[in-house]
Amino acid sequence: MTDHLSRRHFAGAIGLGLLAPAAFAQTLKDIRTLKPGEFTWHPERSPAGPVAIIVSIPDQRVHVYRGGIRIGVSTCSTGKPGHETPTGVFTILQKDKDHKSSTYNNAPMPNMNRLTWDGIALHAGKLPGYPASHGCVRLPMRFSEHV
């Protein structure tokens, strides 16, 4: 049953892309033209289901899916040269709304979602439009409140 539901959700998402009504086409355009700090958030598209977060390092974008349906896209800032954001599949290990870095002089890491125990997390931070972090994935403050 799980495979059937997954295929159905995936096919539904693909179907929307192929049929692309004007409103959906506008959303796709908006995703490509987001400026640093901008995001879209539409939780009503899929009110329940497992959540997956995909970080595109080349595009400096974070995509949030719930129940196999994309509900949000945001700009981000990943690791700068020498501090690259690791790639792979991670589980959120810890959440802390008011976290402070133990590595970088108590630097604030609002709405922190820890990915590794050696300091990699999703959190709110500065978004210059290019990779600039020490390996974390920086998000807009308001977007980080939803993740």
Regions found by a protein language model. Give the residues of each.
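N-terminal pre-domains immediately preceding structured catalytic cores
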Residues: 2-112, 117-147
